[in-house]
């Protein structure tokens, strides 16, 4: 059996906000170091680090390797950076589980990191030289993170098409986003995230600043949500508020087997019951989590109503709405502390972040079974089922 010994994350900073002076490896290092320490392990106990990062341009070689070494792990620890777009962090956990099952590793730190604030602009054709005419500057964040590779259409346009197809109104999506924001504000104000967040110390000319709570929920103005202009279509229903926020952050989980945990005297938080990937046409990425959840439910033998809590990443409000409607879920069990519409969506981290949040939410509420799922650009989705120990 695969178990999760510890699970932490940094706070999420807004775009060009509180964490914008930190690189992705800087943030990843903070999460890795704390996860290992909380697990009661020594840095030398970790066999490998598998970390997601979607926007690596300009970060130099091996972002996961950089984060691992900054975290104080020895040079003998392997490190792999993976890119499955929004699913990178969750896929890292899945690959960690696979490696442990295969016997190629005993203890793995898995997770993800992103500094969307520091994603560079790229000079196309600069290597060959600009002989004549106009050149082009490409936004690394947009091209690699937020646009369909084949069509160049933004994820928002494709999401808007699905929202239109499913008949989701502006009012329905705004109502969902407002609910998410209210939940997030309540969670921040009541300290619900304290158990999962590791503080990040940011140095500035004015001295060190400790960032230990998500930046965006308390800055949002709920009364302005209904007044925002459509973001992707003149008469569209998706806005900046009922879509996820561009942000920075990292998350890390210590993954091992039940046997190794027992041998080392570790106290696991949860067991990994099942995980799955679902893939379909790229334009249908927003509904792909429904298929991933179906696969996980089949593997576990659980019924949807048996699941105590759900984390469905709110890349757009309508993604979570599709999952809720697809399985007739109780909305009070979905993203109980708010989701990406309110908290943020640092691409490489979100997949692991929602697992971290799910574990701690189950602990706080006395639940046991949980499922986390998220959509992925390119028409994919991943889902994972966990059960507290």
Q: What is the role of each PLM region?
A:
Residues 157-160, 196, 203-204, 273-342:
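Active-site pocket-lining segment
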Residues 53-107, 149-154, 219-245, 326-353, ...:
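Conserved catalytic cysteine-centered active-site region
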Residues 20-108, 112-131, 197-211, 284, ...:
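Conserved beta-ketoacyl condensing-enzyme motif
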Residues 1-22, 137, 220-287, 291, ...:
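Condensing-enzyme catalytic core mediating Claisen C-C bond formation in acyl metabolism
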Residues 82-114, 163-192, 252-259, 324, ...:
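Active-site-proximal alpha-helical scaffold in enzymes
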Residues 9-10, 21-30, 38, 172-263, ...:
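N-terminal extracellular/periplasmic Venus flytrap/periplasmic-binding protein-like
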Residues 107-161:
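Flexible glycine-/small-residue-enriched beta->alpha junction loops
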Residues 24-40, 63-67, 92, 155-162, ...:
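Short, well-ordered amphipathic alpha-helical segments that serve as non-catalytic structural scaffolds
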